[in-house]
Design a protein with these regions (language model features):
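SF2 helicase catalytic motif II
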Residues: 46-49, 60-95
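A short beta-strand element within the Helicase C-terminal
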Residues: 327-343, 349
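Residues immediately C-terminal
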Residues: 47-50, 79-82, 110, 327-328, ...
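Conserved C-terminal RecA-like helicase domain
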Residues: 1-42, 57-59, 64-71, 187-320
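Conserved helicase ATPase motor motifs in RecA-like P-loop NTPase domains
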Residues: 77-80, 91-117
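Conserved interdomain linker/interface between the two RecA-like ATPase lobes of SF2 helicase motors
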Residues: 104, 114, 124-243
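Conserved SF2 helicase motif VI
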Residues: 344-369
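The feature captures the C-terminal accessory region of ATP-dependent helicases
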Residues: 203-231, 235, 241-258, 263, ...
């Protein structure tokens, strides 16, 4: 049986002999050996989570074997949604049970999650020690470190949760103190301001949002830019919570005229592009937004010189309109940002992309991050607004959804990780809900991990290992379906066409008869002096890859043209639209 997805390509050319070879030698492709032998394996958590979530079919075996022979590094573990945290705890518990070390890497680790992951790991390690360590003294080796300091080596052995909490609190206290001292020495790089949405009852919420964002973009460019003798430029990030509303607002923005003597260049960045096109966008942004050398932005290869040369206007505003994919994992340096709020965590993480590489020579004269006072769900009058992404749920909610009423000024001016990593000192609520967004998030995390109906703690505090009921009730990535689609091009003279890989039969079959409807947007209304930043025509990108890999255009699509669509509960819409510069999206209800 092939326990590895047939479409998964493994790039590794090192030795493939290992301690488990006698069990894997019958697999002729050696892909399993490659994944087990690679000294460092980099993957998304989706490839590892089957180790504890798989209940049938054998797909969990490879993840289990890899964790049996390796340590585990989790980058941004707190980026997962509330419903996925129990599965994360189960994975850490399993790593402890196998005797693996676990490293948690994040600048925004909330206390509740730190405590839950310690408890789950300790419970697993206790089982490992029982089988492998004679006379274990109940201690677990733990350490904390950041760019300022490391925890005391002498106190590395932790006996129980109380001892862990003491060490963690001391480390967080030292970190917050170091952050404050740094702000005293250097001007804060990221200062927020809550920017009120201008509402008009005669227009849709999306239009009100687009008008406000356009105004914010122009204001931020005026105050935060780079200049030379001929041009004034700025590169900003507009973050929105969900892809379909993001595209709806993008369409409205590109239809608005740019201010006088100004050119606006837009890029829509989210996860619903074929892999090749998303990779192309990310490569472009990675290069241009690496601003460790301030002068590189004016160059042709590393900057925007080519774009500037094609337009005579003096002011050029480059706007990346992004979903939450822009918050983590990208080493980008923007001049400013506009944020549709979802959570305190997303605000802090996104702020880390503003002035990321450069140092300020003087104090900011005005805020460089505008937090919209409401998100689109609030504008539409929905009862639960900070969810998917966010922490609200029917039984745990906020009393208000206007940031001006649920954030204190010191939580966004300046913006740093302090609100996220510091334990809350007081809880304020009224009959309608909690009164502070940051405190509410800490409460929601603790509820999900330790006291909720489907709390994560049940895994290590009880013994549910003999069945898959916990995994069934606490599903990781809780979606109805996840189907693979491919954008294929037969040759350079034919238009791209969507295909569906039917995995419901064996072997899987590629067909043009897709379960969903794909439409192509041919034209868009564009305002004066408004352009798309990059050429994202599939044939251009595919042709370059065909040359690079010496393969045919159709093979490029089959290898790099995948886009997986997850069908979430409550969404019965099966009609999608595709535009080369907007990606795949669905129309939103503009009530």
């Amino acid at each position: 049986q092939d326990i590895l997805d047939a479409e998964l390509y493994v790039d590794y050319s090192g030795p493939t002999s290992h301690s488990l070879s006698k069990w894997t030698k019958y697999h002729k492709t050696k892909r399993i050996d490659k994944l087990l032998c690679a000294p460092v394996l980099v993957s998304t958590i989706d490839h590892l989570i089957p180790a504890t979530e798989g209940t049938k079919g054998g797909k969990q075996i490879l993840a289990m074997l890899r964790l049996l022979t390796a340590d585990l590094v989790l980058d941004e573990p707190d980026d997962l949604g509330l419903s996925d945290l129990p599965a994360l705890c189960r994975l850490v518990n399993w790593a402890g049970m196998l005797g693996s070390k676990v490293l948690l890497s994040t600048a925004t680790m909330p206390p509740a999650l730190a405590y839950a992951l310690y408890e789950s790991y300790r419970a697993g390690w206790a089982q490992y020690a029982k089988a492998n360590l004679d006379g274990w003294n109940q201690n677990v080796c733990c350490t904390w470190f950041d760019e300022f300091t490391t925890s005391d080596y002498k106190n590395r052995f932790i006996f129980d949760l109380a001892g862990y909490k003491n060490q963690h609190r001391q480390f967080v206290k030292n970190r917050i103190s170091a952050l404050k001292k740094e702000q005293e020495k250097k001007p804060p790089k990221r200062v927020g301001e809550i920017f009120s949405i201008q509402k008009c009852d005669e227009t849709s919420p999306e239009k009100n949002l687009a008008n406000t964002i356009h105004q914010a973009v122009c204001i931020l460019h005026k105050h935060h830019h780079e200049r030379n003798d001929e041009k004034i430029i700025s590169i900003g990030l507009v973050r929105m919570a969900n892809i379909n509303p993001l595209i709806a607002v993008t369409k409205l923005l590109i239809a608005m005229d740019a201010p006088e003597d100004t050119c606006i260049h837009y890029c829509a960045y989210h996860s619903r592009y074929p892999l090749a096109i998303r990779s192309h966008i990310e490569n472009k942004l990675d290069t241009i937004l690496n601003r460790k050398d301030k002068s590189s932005i004016w160059e042709t290869e590393k900057g925007v010189a080519d774009t500037l040369a094609g337009h005579p206007q003096k002011n050029h505003i480059f706007v990346v309109l992004a979903s939450p994919v822009a918050e983590v994992g990208r080493d980008h340096d923007y001049d400013w940002a506009v944020v549709e709020p979802s959570s305190m965590r997303s605000i802090i993480q996104l702020a880390g992309r503003v002035v990321r590489h450069r140092e300020l020579s003087e104090q900011l004269k005005s805020p460089n991050i505008f937090l919209l006072n409401e998100n689109l769900k609030a504008l539409k009058g929905q009862r639960i607004c900070f969810e998917r992404p966010g922490f609200e749920m029917p039984r745990l909610g906020l009393a208000n959804h206007d940031l001006k009423k649920i954030l204190d000024i010191d939580q966004y001016n300046p913006i740093d990780s302090t609100p996220r990593i510091e334990e809350i000192k007081e809880i304020q609520k009224n009959p309608n809900g909690y009164l502070n967004l940051n405190a509410f998030e800490h409460i929601a995390l603790a509820w999900q991990l330790f006291s909720g109906d489907k709390k994560a703690k049940v895994w290590w505090a009880n013994t549910p290992y003999w069945c898959g009921e916990v995994q069934r009730q606490q599903r990781f990535r809780d979606s109805i379906d996840d189907e693979p689609y491919y954008l294929l091009i037969e040759n350079e003279y034919q238009n791209p066409r969507w295909h569906w890989l039917n995995e419901n039969q064996y072997p899987p079959v590629m067909t043009t008869e897709t379960p969903v409807t794909f439409n192509t947007l041919q034209t868009l209304e564009m305002g004066d002096n408004v352009h798309f930043w990059f050429d994202l025509a599939p044939v251009t990108i595919y042709s370059q890859l065909a040359d690079d890999f010496a393969i045919e255009l159709r093979d490029v699509g089959q290898r790099f043209g995948e886009l997986r669509i997850a069908e979430y509960s409550g969404n019965d819409n099966q009609e999608y639209w595709y535009h080369k510069n907007l990606g795949l999206h669905q129309e939103v209800n503009k009530r």
